[in-house]
Amino acid sequence: MPKNSHHHRSSSVNSTKSRSTESTNKWKIPHYYRRSASGSTQASPDRNSSTGSCSTPVLPTMNVMSSPKKVLLEDPRDNHTKAKKSSRKKSGEMVFVNYTVQDTANENDTDLQTQPVSVPAPKAKLKKKSSKRRMLKIFGSSKNEHIEDIVEEQPMVLQMDSESKPLSGTPISESGIDASSLTTKRSYNSFLKHNRLNGKTPFSGNLSFPSLNMMGNTTDLPIDNNDFCSEKEVVPKSTHDPSLAKPPSRFTESETNSTPNLSSIPLMNTKNTRLKYNKVAPQSSDRQKSQESGLYHSTESFNFKDQNYSNNKSSLSLNSDLSTPHFAKHSPDSPRTSRSFNCGDSQSKVKLPEENDASIAFSKMFTRKRANTGGSTCSLASPTIAQTIQQSNIKVNKLPTQRTTSVGSLSSMSNRYSPIRVASPGRARSATRGSSLYRLSRDLNSLPSVTDLPEMDSTTPVNEIFLDGQPQHKSGSVKGGHRKKQESISDAQRIQHSNSYITTPSSSLVTPPYYMTGYTLPSSASASSTPNVLETHNMNFVPSTSTVTSYRPSSNFSSFDKEYSNENDASGEFSAFNTPMENIPALKGIPRSTLEENEEEDVLVQDIPNTAHFQRRDIMGMDTHRKDDSLDFNSLMPHGSTTSSSIVDSVMTNSISTTTSNATGNYFQDQDKYTLVNTGLGLSDANLDHFIRSQWKHASRSESNNNTGNRVSYSGSTPNNVDTTKTNLQVYTEFDFENPESFFHEQSKLLGEMGHSNNNSNSAINMNEPKSADTYIGNISPDTSATVSLGDLMGSNVSNNSERNFYDGHTFVPQYQANSSVENSNNQNAAPIANNDIDNNLQSFYFDNSN
């Protein structure tokens, strides 16, 4: 019966108190919780023998779950049929909880009386039952079951019985040691709970209120507790109350000094007790002090009770001993006082049914609050999370205009709007899913333009924005779990740009948000609707087809001073959002505005002063933005570096300087401005051969039948033959001014080859150019594999001396930008070569390709 021995530990303690033949089956904390006890032997030999015999054969055969029930039932049967019956009923009631059972010996016939009254401990030792019965009477018979239940919940109940017994009749020393220790367990549950419930009853009032009241009312108590010589005790108590109060107060002070926190802590020990004693305090400071001394001991034990019941016994016995000399003649009452207060503490504790050993252990194991990953209602209701949400809202409302906003900065909004990340601000950048951070941008259309923070002004009802609003045009491929709660900003934009047509993206494509340009880009970062690097750029600066050009403020050049930036911080911050190069082949073309802005972004990285606009050419081939002739090219281009950004590198090149061959497979089909960028990486000798050759070669696939004549014009002049139906291929050419020959050496032959390869093409030269330089034009045809050689362009007709005059040691990489007209049915290209003022160190070649 090792199992029973564990269970019977408290029973052994009880047996020490009351030595009765009958054993009581008491429920301890959940069965898994066992107190280690030296083979606790049941005080009743009959019980022990019967239980031993019954439990020993039964336990090995029985399952752990069922064993406590069977053992309990059999044991009471073996001892006494009556007691067995009552214990069976109660044990059966308990068993459903699957708790373990303790066997304790009770003494007197009173147990028989008490058994029907107290459900859990009907088997309690006769004297225990009698004492318990008395206690129950004091508390009120109606609440006996309650008491027992609570006691059952907490293993201290058994000691409660023993406690009541020593209170009734055990000597001071005995009560001080065994009775008090037992009292700690037992008294906590039954006494306190019932005191609270029946505060009006005289004894409960005594327990709950200061010791003085208890002393004065001891007459009531002796009636209930026959064992106590209450009458004798009552008079001295009442008389000595004030005197007793003083020494205890001194004692309390000394005790408090020695252990300054204990006396105060008991009062603070539990919420209920704290309130209770605070209320009592005004009645009599002396009383409370005397009480405090008792409380000090009792509470101390009670504190230990929370920590460990075994400690409670020793501490409680010490308490009773300590309190005894202070109460001198009334030593039997001092343990009672401490017990009563202990009961008060336990009562408050018992008030919370979950406060049992199991709950305490569980709370100790799980002290931390779980992180709110799911955004449950409770978590949202918590003040901290509410504050976090408010802060996030404030962030959303107060997005600083001077701050560079990026997709990464949307995390502040994601906390509020993201259906997944409802309110877990600590996990703004959760890596659970590549695009989980951007779930808020299920469709960034619903957000105001991330980079156009001017729209985030007070005029924009930011709080009204719902990130999960799905634009109606989105295909069903995007998860339909998000419902549009209101008209999103993107819808308003579409209404404004009603003339812009929108293509429904496939599952792998995402319509560039906010500005619907009529074409879709593959979301290379993820298959979800999260915009990738290109899309985020396109989102704000790709004009709709109705808008011919996109004007970009010059303030974008400074990465710190810029009012807003189209730079996608996510690409830099999150490697997951760097455009995978394996997805590049899916790109049909890159919007001109995107790469042009990327070029500018490199300039931003270089901290180039923002003094100029890139020249944008509309479908007519005319400059939509005035370009300063006095503009210094240094203001536009990074010194000794390239204009391409890492984003462009990843998008356009598989290797650093090699442009993906199929990136422009349908170069002219989307009918918008495109840009191809070759990254020279600041090489003094940039190989334009591969770049120009491959790009012209692939660009020509869509119009292999069009061998166009080439015209050259300077930006200040309009091409001789302005054909609105022809797309303008805009080229910004940059090269090493210090080493022009080396820079153009490889291309010199290729240009000639290209010029000779197109014999059927007409070449026209627009001589509206400064007299300071000659312009050479070769036949540049998209279908040829030849490379435009600036060396030939510059070297053939422009003197090297004049070139060297404006070589400033900067390496430039050409940027090809196709301006496709809406009416470009023939896919014809006009690429004027424009040389701005060479004296101003700025060269731009515009190649007009026309039939």
Swiss-Prot record:
Basic residues: bias regions: 1-10
- Biological process GO annotation list? G1/S transition of mitotic cell cycle; positive regulation of gene expression; regulation of cell cycle
The alphabetical list of record keywords is: Phosphoprotein
GO cellular component terms given for this protein: cytoplasm; nucleus
Q: Where is the composition biased (Polar residues)?
A: 37-66, 254-271, 334-349, 489-504, 702-722
Indicate where the modification Phosphoserine is found in the sequence.
S334, S757, S761
Q: Where is this region: Disordered?
A: 1-91, 233-271, 315-355, 466-504, 698-722
Q: Where is the composition biased (Low complexity)?
A: 11-23
| Basic and acidic residues: compositionally biased ranges | 71-81
User: What is the protein's known function?
Assistant: Dosage dependent suppressor of PKC1 deletion and MPK1 deletion. Involved in cell lysis.
Q: What is this protein called?
A: Protein BCK2
List the source organism: Saccharomyces cerevisiae (strain ATCC 204508 / S288c) (Baker's yeast)
